[in-house]
Amino acid sequence: MSGVRVLVCGGRDNLDRAFVFAMLDQVLAKHPLMAICHGGATGVDQIAGEWASAHDVPVTEFAADWSLGSKAGPLRNARMLDEFRPTGVVAFPGGRGTADMTRQAEAAGLPVWRPVAEQRP
């Protein structure tokens, strides 16, 4: 796939569909050839998947293997970086999993955009 590959992450409790859609619309307007990936969780991940379906944007889901216990999330996050090879990250507000994802992405030298409600169009 040519174009921008965007990893989307954020909190499970973040259910602001309009906000997530508006911010991803901004990314799509700048990068019409894009694909996204997410971690398959409820909240932002699920909303990002819905957004991708509504906009015919290719989406890849990386579910965590929770049988691995507390390291499942960080291992899934590393897998998203290694296998999807994103060119950037959109990190919506979240908790420890989002913080781990952004730490790993920044350590890999990827740009991370952290949208906040004030950026809503």
Segments and roles (model prediction):
Residues 2-6, 14-121:
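Acidic/glycine-enriched connector segments
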